[in-house]
Amino acid sequence: KLLRMNQLDKFKKFIEDRNENVKVGLVGAGQMGQGIIAQVSRMYGVELVCIIDRNQKQLEIAANRYKKLKNNSLLCSDSITALDNVELDILIEATGTPSAGALVAKNVLNRGINLILLNVETEATIGLALRKEAEKNGAIVTVADGDEPVAALDLYNFATELSFEVISIGKGKNNPFNRFATPSSLKKEASLKKMNPKMLTSFVDGTKTMVEMTALANFLDFNIDVDGMHGIEATYENINQYYIPKKDGGLLDNSQVVDFAFGIAPGVFAVIYSEDEYVNYEMEYLKMGEGPYWTLARPYHLTSLEIPRTIRHIMLEKYSKLSAQSWNVEVVAYAKQDIEPGTNLGSI
């Protein structure tokens, strides 16, 4: 009898052999946290045991959402010190704030608890240090499925497994670009979208894109072609004409770079290359366009809704999906207005 053994089946067997649920904690009960709660509550063999958030209203909404779906005890707190007394297999950090992410990481990695970051801001800031701390304590730290870095990484893995060379890789810019956007200017739009104005600002002003591509580059040991990246207008059909070497009519002085493009949101892309004549014939026959540069694409990423994949991966495969292995790229701040000495910069 043939057995179908996908990740769901493997995880079910893992739980049956373990005879104990995987215990998960969550820090950050905002928009992303609510999606995590909805998904974790539907996972076989996974139990959410604590939710931490400084916002009491969000904390209450999150707790009520989970308790409606699962009838187990749940610790709720507005302080990360509550984690000290909780037994966990995995902690999911979903605040989107580097300072909070760093404090949470210190708390759990020192105890050998695995850490999933739906907080790529922390990864882009101290990712290499987090990886070293995790390895020292026998834990795993990884960026979550659902964010563009891991979605793009799936394309990279697919391409390299087929012996293609990845020339460039990146994401689509989702929101209209306004480098001068602020939380106050986006307050109304954020309210309509049920988002934190600071988070929406990071999408609109380009911060999120820079942070995400930094995380991807530092894992793959890639770089950027120019400061700030090119960020061109492109489509899935023609991006392989631009993000290729200049000698072949493209924009790039370098290969193995990360970048982004307007016009392909909310997906990710990889421009790949083969020097083999027959491979290129096959790719053209398979209606992949004209080579020798080809585009692989995934036209979506499902943010917090993909968290079950990361949980299962950590418990079954026991290695990080994406965590800095080099430090080639960093993100720096760029002023949106003239700033007088002594001005409180706020956060974005």
Outline where the language-model segments fall.
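Beta-loop-alpha module in the N-terminal Rossmann-like domain of NAD(P)-dependent dehydrogenases
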Residues: 77-81, 86-108, 121-124
